[in-house]
Amino acid sequence: MKEYKVFRSISFQEEIAKYDKNIQDRVDKIEDKLIYNSEYGNPLGTKWFRESRFENYRIYYLIYEDLGAIYMVAISGKKDQQKTINTIRLFLEFFREEIEKLIREDNLQDEES
């Protein structure tokens, strides 16, 4: 199975930092699973937009097969689920540009190492 590189958006990382350590650890475990299983979680209308649920939370991520990357972009509770999904869909082009930039920066760091 293809191995993916998982990235977190700045807004996602800032939001996760507000949660207690238990929630942060669960997010880390989901991230670890995504490296080897891009189909982890539930599809949200397409195979490249998915969510993973635990307790009352949903983690949203975008899969970029052509880039070999997964981008974790949001967390929400059940009651904000549809609003969050709609917002992510509005910003798909922005997320694509952001992940491409992160990958370029990551590749530069790898070359310097």
At which residue positions do the language-model features occur?
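A short, surface-exposed loop/turn module that caps and links secondary-structure elements
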Residues: D28-F54, I99-L108
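Enriched for short, Lys/Arg-rich terminal
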Residues: K2-K5, L62-S113
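Conserved short-loop catalytic and cofactor-binding motifs
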Residues: E15, F49, S76
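Negatively charged, low-complexity tracts enriched in Asp/Glu with abundant Ser/Thr
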Residues: K2-G45
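ATP/adenylate-binding site constellation spanning eukaryotic-like Ser/Thr protein kinases
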Residues: T46, Y57, D66
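Short coil/turn residues that cap or connect secondary-structure elements
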Residues: Y19, R53-N56, D80
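Short, surface-exposed charged micro-motifs
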Residues: E51, R58-L62
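Short, well-ordered turn and helix-capping elements at secondary-structure junctions
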Residues: S38, N56-R58, S76
